Amino acid sequence: MPETPFVTFTGVVAGYGGGDVLKNVDFSVAQGGVTCIVGPNGSGKSTLLKTVSGLVKPRLGEIWFKGQNLVGKSPREILKMGIVQVPQNHSLFREMTVEQNVELGAFLERDKRVIAERLERIRTMFPIVAERAKDKAGALSGGQQRLVEFARCLMLEPDLVVLDEPSMGLDPKTLKIMFATIKMMNEAGRTVLLVEQNARQALKLSHHGVVLENGRVRLTGTGREVLDNPEIGALYLGGSLEEASHAASEKGHS
């Protein structure tokens, strides 16, 4: 895997009116990989993603992407730079067809021939776009809508895809398809940064993992290293309390 820093967080402090949620966050996202952020509720995971897409402006610090500081740039400017975020909540226009929704992803492109070529590639990558092209988006299940949202974001041909809890509300069958789709997007050349409630499954396909706790980076490593850490596994990934206690004891005596 390439290890070239693609996105770099340096001393990022950000939050809302009630105070700081992110507290001096430092880490890098490697180019060409999948990076998964895990941690307890309220640790700042979704806020971190919003700083990348311009929805939350850091109070302090810098976020570098391809040689440019994202801090202070609008969401539209960031979109034009090649960063697309798929929101946690479904965002399709229910009364428009699947194909119309997907085409909206290319709104920055004015050449109709280019749009048609992209749409043809998307149909190949996402069978649902071809099979349900003329159906209203509102007729799709939640999982099907999520796949169409993935397809729409790729119409922009982004360099970085940001995913906030993409598996939320999905049934086991669609969940499997969703993770396979994330892997496919990455293999197609997209760098992926995601927050995912099914952390174990997400870390298995991730090249890198970041653990947030109380707005700070507690641990970084490969996806496998984070997954195999007994203390992290017990606290955030559904492991046993005995594992956490044993890991903490060993750490205290090391």
Each predicted region: which residue ranges?
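Conserved ABC ATPase signature
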Residues: 136-140
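Conserved catalytic motifs of ABC-family nucleotide-binding domains
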Residues: 157
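ABC ATPase C-loop
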Residues: 153-154
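Conserved ABC transporter NBD signature motif
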Residues: 61-69, 81, 115-119, 221
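The feature captures the beta-strand-to-loop junction immediately N-terminal to the Walker
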Residues: 38-40
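ABC-type ATPase nucleotide-binding domains, specifically the catalytic core motifs of the NBD
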Residues: 17, 73, 98-117, 125-127, ...
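Helix-to-loop junction immediately C-terminal to a conserved catalytic motif
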Residues: 53
